[in-house]
């Protein structure tokens, strides 16, 4: 048949059997790997020898034709005419070929046929203990045609349609079966058709991935996830566990039983495998054992066979390069002559083809993952072992990934001076006969794996006692600096601790730490056994590890440390209380020192960033994860430093670190400590501070929801201050806080929050009762005469600090309050008041800011107060409750719940039980909306309103421009009292708002300007002056002292025109006590008559 008919028709020539397995097994690499063994053999003696069975007749079984063909690279052995040889197939007609191929593609194997899927029907017999000749499976029929078989049908090529092989393997001439070896006879005495002795775990031989997500080119997920228990067994275990010959033959037989019955006796393939490998191979007895099962051909039913199989398991001799050490196994010595055919250079293309031919596929799955990574020059991330053994001799190859399996395994053999690189997957095995055998160490079954695993995840602390590994924050920073300076480690740390570090270096140092801290992520779990019982007694052996402390500890407990020069011995208490580290002298020890990230406020140093502590840090990531408060289980130990014959005893204390310390927070705290240390070294001796307890009192008194600044807060008490002066200073400090808060709010463009001052007044002053019956009491009094004018804004003013000083004594209220405080309140209140025009606005603004009446009560309308009568006595147990006696009238403000009311009694607001009172029917209004007009006879004239005037109080009269007003009397030089004719509207109004059109000489009277009371300041009046006239106040000129004397306890600023101004220690003659808690009386100091809160005075 011509050469051009070969791609389209069955060929009359067959390829030699040596190409059969390699061609079928390749996936896209047939041209590269088909000449693996034939070409290698040719390179040895220049020719290729092949035994080609032409037919299976009885005559041809005895005839062996040796064809010498020239070598054409890439196509394998050819015949005399240059046409590649072919093998027989079992297809008689083309349609049968397609039918067979379809069946092969869609064949579904049973679970017990897994071995057949992955064990090919024809193999090289290269096992160590197999017979030199094994039975030939699948004899072919004599009527078979020849068809070339170059690729498996899974390849996408133009010739793929003719490359699929039949389910029956190609025929071969079975040579006579020689006698079996003694050790293999027991396993093959059974009939060749019988199944294996026992069911084999086929998971050992699967190579295809279970799913597409587990697939990696060149690797097998099964090899990685279902690795057999041991890839390395002794010869006895291997022979007992799975006899190579019987298992491989049984797989061939089971495959044969599925496809077709055999014709002829089973024969071995040893002679064929030998002839394919070497021309002189057939002449040497027993030589076939070297290459038994070297290759496992793939049938079309299992195309994924090329990804790797159990060949390395079946033939470890081929996977063991004798060239590595030159000493093959003792079991292979008898065939060492032919081991040279397998000594392929590692870097040659044949070696790559050899590996692609699955010789190393099985066991190199783990090797590839480690050895291929050594090609990359990039150094991998460092593990804990690198931190512990950071020595040059531990890493002969700097490019090796330290976490790789090879390096971890060789670490166990480092004491034996392993001569090969760490990345090598082969380690020597010392055998009993003195010979060493190179074998691949199992990933999970290696002798040192368990020990290595424990070492990775559980580090012995004794190995770390003298280690120079520092895992704390500052220590890593200092370690980095010492490495940059190439100095001795301990000496560099000591010097860095005392050097002045420039400010601009601090961010750089912390940035480097942010890189170094990533390496600590690999720190292993140190276990719980070393974190057991905490002892506060310093151990005497000095080997107890010292616990590192968190840098967060700086921000807490900063005021708890005493003077640095006072050294304290080890704590004798078992209480886990954070205490500051202190030393016995101002000079830092310079001996064996290390650094910690604990709080160092009590240590005298140039930089508090660096502290001298001994030991290692055992604060790992997993410790933080395992313990909510890790550092509370720290160790206590003594660090005895010998420096100039002085013993410096450091106290190792508990840290307040409550979790991970991210680098970002460490950056902040480290900078803060750096600045603080620099500031403390240069600041002057601190002035004497007040009692810290009084500062706390000032904080409690101050309603401002913020703390004092740390630099202004007292830190220590130098001497016992006088109690009264300290109270004044504390209150003055609280007022300064309020002033600062108001200024800050004004800078933001908003007026100060009125609730701040209100809260302060509410804390300092008693509640002011609500006015009720006292409104009528003043008007009923015969002493009700207008005499004294008010300031221009219509409000009765007190000294500017009066609203804020509250309960303070007079000395604190007047003399001790600084001018800045007063001016602040002046401006703030003045600015708030000048925004409004009416007198009532001024008064209400002062009321909101400075009145002590509770907000709930002021905001409660009169109609919402329900009177109730107390049926039992109730005594308040807390400050929120309201006391009353049986028969008292209590005004209910609201219902708290089903058991409690909130109400008012005698000006005080509180809660009381519902069952203690009975509701009363609301009484009729005791007074009209405005006071009745004064009984002044006659009229003094008439006037016309020139401007609109809005009444702000009940005594004022609203006017509209053009209204006619009847003038009843002249209250003072600025106010008229009048009424609008035809209505009952009557009140006072400014003189400047009306134009007098008619005036009676009888009632007109000019009033001189009244003298300003001494409590007023001229600048206050001028700063708050307005165009409005002053409002009158009533006084009693003929004070006879007939009232009951009371003394004022607190300052009180009037908010209505009929109220009396009180100053502390004023004496007031009380004329009447109203039932709403207000008193009516005359002040002996000002000679004014009015009402005032009864709870602001006491009986003399």
Swiss-Prot record:
UniProt xrefs under Pfam families: SH3_1, SH3_9, Sorb
Domain SH3 intervals: 863-922, 938-999, 1041-1100
Record-level Gene Ontology MF annotations: cytoskeletal anchor activity; identical protein binding; RNA binding; structural constituent of cytoskeleton; structural constituent of muscle
Phosphothreonine sites (modified residues): 277, 292
Keyword Ubl conjugation: yes
Coiled coil: none
Any single Gene Ontology cellular-component annotation: Z disc
Name used for this protein in its record: Sorbin and SH3 domain-containing protein 2
């Amino acid at each position: 048949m011509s050469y051009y008919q070969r791609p389209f028709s069955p060929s009359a020539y067959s390829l030699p059997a040596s190409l059969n397995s390699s061609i079928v097994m390749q996936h896209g690499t047939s041209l590269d790997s088909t000449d693996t063994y034939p070409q290698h053999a040719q390179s040895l003696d220049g020719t290729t020898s092949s035994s080609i069975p032409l037919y299976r007749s009885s005559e041809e079984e005895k005839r062996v034709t040796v064809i010498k063909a020239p070598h054409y690279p890439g196509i394998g052995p050819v015949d005399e005419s240059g046409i590649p040889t072919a093998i027989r197939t079992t297809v008689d007609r083309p349609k049968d070929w397609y039918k067979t191929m379809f069946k092969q593609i869609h064949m579904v194997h049973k679970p017990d046929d897994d071995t057949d899927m992955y064990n090919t029907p024809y193999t090289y017999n290269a096992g160590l203990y197999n017979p030199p000749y094994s039975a030939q499976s699948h004899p072919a029929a004599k009527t078979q045609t020849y068809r070339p078989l170059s690729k498996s049908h899974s390849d996408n090529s133009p010739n793929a349609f003719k490359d699929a092989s039949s389910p029956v393997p190609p025929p071969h001439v079975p040579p006579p079966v020689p006698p079996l070896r003694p050790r293999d006879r027991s396993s093959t005495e059974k009939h060749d058709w019988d199944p294996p002795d026992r069911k084999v775990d086929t998971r050992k031989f699967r190579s295809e991935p279970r799913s597409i997500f587990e697939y990696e080119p060149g690797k097998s997920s099964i090899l990685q996830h279902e690795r057999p228990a041991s890839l390395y067994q002794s010869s006895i275990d291997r022979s007992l566990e799975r006899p190579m010959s019987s298992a491989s033959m049984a797989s061939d037989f089971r495959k044969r039983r599925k496809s077709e019955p055999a014709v002829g006796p089973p024969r071995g393939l040893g002679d064929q495998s030998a002839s394919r490998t070497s021309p002189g191979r057939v002449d040497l007895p027993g030589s076939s054992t070297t290459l038994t099962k070297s290759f496992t051909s793939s049938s079309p039913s299992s195309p994924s066979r090329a990804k790797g199989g159990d060949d390395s398991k079946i033939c470890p001799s081929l996977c063991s390069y004798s060239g590595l050490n030159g000493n093959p196994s003792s079991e292979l010595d008898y065939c060492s002559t032919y081991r040279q055919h397998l000594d392929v250079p590692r870097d040659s293309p044949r070696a790559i083809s050899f590996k692609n031919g699955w010789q190393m596929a099985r066991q190199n799955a783990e090797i590839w993952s480690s050895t291929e990574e050594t090609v990359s020059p990039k150094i991998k991330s460092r593990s804990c072992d690198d931190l512990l053994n950071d020595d040059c001799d531990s890493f002969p190859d700097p490019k090796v990934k330290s976490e790789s399996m090879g390096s971890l395994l060789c670490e166990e053999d480092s004491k034996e001076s392993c001569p090969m690189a760490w990345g090598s997957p082969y380690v020597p095995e010392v055998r009993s006969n003195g010979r060493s055998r190179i074998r691949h160490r199992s990933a999970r079954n290696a002798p040192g794996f368990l020990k290595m695993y424990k070492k990775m995840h559980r580090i012995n602390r004794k190995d770390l006692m003298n280690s120079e590994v520092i895992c704390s924050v500052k220590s890593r920073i200092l370690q980095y600096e010492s490495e940059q300076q190439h100095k001795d480690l301990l000496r560099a740390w000591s010097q860095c601790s005392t050097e002045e570090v420039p400010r601009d270096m601090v961010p750089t140092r912390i940035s480097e730490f942010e890189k170094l801290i990533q390496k600590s992520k690999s720190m292993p779990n140190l276990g719980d056994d070393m974190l057991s019982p905490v002892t506060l007694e310093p151990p005497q052996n000095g080997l107890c590890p010292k616990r590192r402390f968190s840098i967060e500890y700086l921000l807490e407990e900063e005021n708890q440390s005493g003077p640095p020069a006072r050294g304290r011995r080890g704590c004798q208490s078992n209480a886990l209380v954070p205490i500051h580290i202190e030393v016995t002298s101002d000079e830092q020890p310079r001996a064996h020192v290390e650094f910690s990230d604990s709080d160092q406020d009590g240590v005298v140093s140039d930089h508090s960033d660096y502290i001298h502590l001994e030991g290692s840090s055992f604060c790992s990531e997993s410790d933080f994860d395992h313990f909510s408060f890790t550092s509370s289980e720290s160790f206590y130990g003594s660090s005895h430093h010998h420096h100039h014959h002085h013993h410096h005893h450091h106290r190792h204390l508990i840290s307040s670190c409550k979790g991970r310390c991210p680098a970002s927070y460490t950056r902040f705290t480290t900078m803060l400590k750096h600045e603080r240390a620099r500031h403390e070294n240069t600041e002057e001796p601190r002035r004497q501070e007040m009692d810290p307890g009084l500062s706390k009192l000032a904080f409690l008194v101050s309603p401002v929801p913020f703390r004092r600044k740390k630099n202004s807060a007292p830190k220590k008490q130098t001497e016992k201050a006088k109690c009264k002066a300290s109270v004044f200073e504390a209150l003055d400090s609280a007022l300064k806080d309020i002033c600062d808060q108001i200024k800050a709010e004004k800078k933001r463009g908003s007026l100060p929050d009125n609730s701040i001052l209100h809260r302060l007044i509410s804390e300092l002053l008693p509640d002011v009762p609500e006015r009720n019956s006292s409104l009528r009491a003043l008007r009923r009094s015969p002493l009700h005469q207008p005499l004294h004018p008010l300031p221009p804004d219509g409000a009765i003013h007190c000294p500017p600090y009066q609203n804020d000083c509250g309960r303070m004594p007079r000395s604190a209220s007047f003399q001790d309050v600084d001018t800045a405080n007063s001016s602040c309140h002046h401006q703030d209140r003045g600015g708030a008041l000048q925004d409004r025009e009416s007198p009532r606005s001024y008064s209400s603004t002062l009321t909101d800011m400075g009145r002590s009446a509770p907000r709930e009560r002021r905001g409660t309308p009169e109609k919402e107060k329900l009177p109730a009568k107390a049926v039992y006595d109730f005594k308040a147990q807390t400050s929120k409750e309201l006391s009353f006696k049986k028969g008292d009238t209590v005004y209910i403000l609201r219902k708290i719940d089903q058991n409690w009311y909130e109400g008012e009694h005698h000006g005080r607001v509180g809660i009381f039980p519902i069952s203690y009172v009975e509701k009363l029917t609301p009484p009729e209004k005791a007074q009209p909306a405005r006071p009745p007009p004064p009984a002044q006879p006659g009229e003094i004239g008439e006037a016309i309103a020139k401007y609109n005037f809005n009444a702000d109080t009940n005594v004022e009269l609203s006017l509209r421009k053009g209204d006619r007003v009847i003038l009843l009397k002249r209250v003072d030089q600025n106010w008229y009292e009048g009424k609008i004719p035809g209505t009952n509207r009557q009140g006072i109004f400014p003189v400047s708002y009306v134009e007098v059109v008619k005036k009676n000489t009888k009632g007109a009277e000019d009033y001189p300007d009244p003298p300003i009371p001494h409590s007023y300041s001229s600048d206050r009046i001028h700063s708050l002056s307005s165009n409005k006239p002053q409002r009158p106040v009533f006084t009693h000129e003929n004070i006879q002292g007939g009232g009951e004397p009371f003394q004022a306890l607190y300052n009180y600023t009037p908010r209505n025109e009929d109220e009396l101004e009180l100053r502390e220690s004023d004496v007031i003659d009380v004329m009447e006590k109203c039932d709403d808690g207000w008193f009516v009386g005359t002040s002996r100091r000002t000679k004014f008559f009015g009402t005032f809160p009864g709870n602001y005075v006491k009986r003399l």
